[in-house]
Amino acid sequence: MLKCQKPLFSLDENVHYLNCAYKSPLLKNGEEMAKKALLSERNPFNLKPHSYFEISDKIRIEFSKIIHCHKNEIALFPSTSYGFANVFNNLKVTRVKAITVENEFPSGFFSIKKWSLENEIMLQTLTRNELSAKDWNQKILDSIDEKTNVVFMSSVHWMDGTKFDIKKIGKKCKSVGAYFIVDGTQSVGAMNINVKEFNIDALICAGYKWLFGPYSMALGYFSSKFNNGTPIEESWMNRTNAQEFSNLTDYDSKYKTMAGRYNVGETANFVLSPIMLNGLKQLNNWGISNIESYCKKLADPLLKQLIPLGIKFEEKNYFNPHLFSLGLPDYIDNINFKKTLDNKNIYVSLRGKNIRVSINVFNDQNDINMLIEAVKSVLK
C-alpha cells in the first residue's frame, strides 16, 4: 500500500488541502526542475537541434504509459481548449445528432456547441435531474443510436465527481459508429484509463491537476481516426524535416505521423516541460492503481462516519474516492459552510451547489478527520 507522499511536497503544515481537482501542489523535485530549466536560459548556446524535440518525446512516452497507447498518438498543447479545437476541427459529419451531458466544463462544451451549430447538428444535452448516477449512465447509453455522430463527455463529472461508465459508453459508441471524445482532466492520473479498451477516439487532459504538471500545459490522445487531419496551426516543428535546421526552407509539407501534427508550436516549452515530465514520471513511479487504493483508504472512513449522520454520497459503483461531493442537509448553506472550512484551513471547492472534495497522495488521515469534524460541527 502506498504511504502518504506529503514529504515530497512543500504544502504548509497547517493547511488541509483537499482540492487537487482545483490545482495540484508542485512537487519539490518539480520545483528543482523548474529552477534548473530557468537557469539554463542563461546559456542558449547549449541548446542543440535535438534539444527542441527530446523532452516532448519523453513526455509522450510517460503519458502513453498512463493511458495505454503509443507515444506517437500523443500531442502537447497549452490548454484543453486548444486540444478540443483540433479534435472538433477534424470531426467528420456523418450523422444528425451530437450528445453531451449537462454542466460540462465550458472549454469542451463550447467546442462541441460550435461544431454542432456550424454543421447543423442537433446537440442533445442529457440532464440528470433527480436521477441516480446509475440511471443517468443508463440514460446516456440509451441515447446513443445510429443517428449519433459524436458523444463528448468527461470520464468523471468535474462538479460533483459522478463516475461515468466510459467503458460501456465507449463500447456503445463503437457499436453504432459514433465518435467518443473524452475530457480526462479530472480522472487521468487518479484512476485507470485505457483509451484502447474504452474505445476512446480522443482524450484531452489539463496538466496542472492530477498529472502534477504546470499551468499552461495539456496533453491529448488521438486515435487513428485523426491520423490524416488538419491541425489548427502550421508549426514548423510538426513537419517531418523539422530536425534538419539547415533545410527548413525546403518547406516539407508533410506532417509528422499520427498525432504529431496536432502539437502546439514551440512544443519544447523549455521552462514548463521539465515540470510536466517530472509529474508524469512520478505518477508512473507511484502507479495509478496504488493512487486509487490510497485515495480509497482515506475516503472509506469519511463515508463510514458521515453516512450514518445523513450525509449523502454517490452509490458505491459510481463513487470516486479521489473526487466527490458532500450531500449536506438542505438547512446548511453551502456558501457559508465553505467559508467555515476556509477559516479552518480546510480547502475544498464550491462548484454549483456542490461542496467538492478531492483527495490525493499528499493527504493524510488528519486531513480527513478535520473535514469530518467540520461537517459534524454544522449538523443539527
Where are these regions (language model features)?
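Pyridoxal 5′-phosphate
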Residues: 1-380
